[in-house]
């Protein structure tokens, strides 16, 4: 639906801000409960999980194409702490951010 697409676009374009489900929903002019229901129904993923996925995808890009430190990346993407960022990244991808950086740097050389 246009509302879900607009919400997804807003989330992808604001990964470097502390995005909440409420803020993303408000951007569409809909209530958080309305957007959560439709988001999950259409995409099969909760909005909060999608927000985290987008932040982690941006982190992967920064790890690959920038020299930013983990502290800079976690701060830029508005994680509450570097250790939280590292834990969430490892839980999602099975490796630490530094291991990911080493792997991707090795492939590009």
Language model regions located:
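Cytosolic nucleotide-utilizing catalytic cores of signal-transduction proteins
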Residues: 1-9, 13-36
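Key DNA-contact positions within bacterial/archaeal DNA-binding proteins
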Residues: 33, 83, 98
């Amino acid at each position: 639906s246009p509302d879900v697409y607009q919400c997804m676009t807003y989330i992808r374009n604001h990964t470097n801000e502390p995005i909440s489900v409420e803020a993303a929903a408000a951007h569409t002019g809909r209530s958080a409960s309305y957007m959560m229901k439709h988001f999950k129904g259409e995409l099969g993923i909760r909005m909060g999980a999608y927000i985290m996925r987008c932040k982690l995808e941006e982190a992967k890009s920064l790890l690959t194409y920038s020299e930013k430190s983990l502290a800079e990346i976690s701060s830029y993407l508005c994680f509450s702490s570097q250790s939280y960022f590292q834990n969430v990244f490892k839980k999602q991808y099975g490796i630490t951010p530094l291991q990911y950086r080493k792997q991707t740097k090795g492939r590009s050389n």
